[in-house]
């Protein structure tokens, strides 16, 4: 399948470009296999850098016409927790792939204040490139009818209550999510 990519004059992909490309690719797959209309994603990490992949993938799949569910378990619950969702941070310690304007030794990244600095840098870089915020991606996911499923066992283990999560979250255990995943043609663990 041929996809129109950005021209040299416009070298950055926008969120709309990504959604269009994914929609075209998924439409091609669905045309070949009409049963391939479901996606299941597991979000198990709750830092700013790990919140983006499951939400971008989920909204792209839903925008392409796929029934999509994201299962938030363990620290992934932070993404949908009312108190934590707006305060997600990225930790540069032990993250050698994290792009920094100036290479820094691990000792420097462990200094007080570096987590806040790295988080601010990531948010500003994403904003400069018109990448939606986590709050916006969550709103988009709900508008696109993505099922946001909080792991009930993890909620119980961590001592949370269902009231502590954003509106629109369903609560279920791993067995219920496995039923969703079993019927899905795309299953991702992020």
Region locations from a protein language model:
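Helix-enriched interaction subdomains in cytosolic or periplasmic regions
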Residues: 1-18
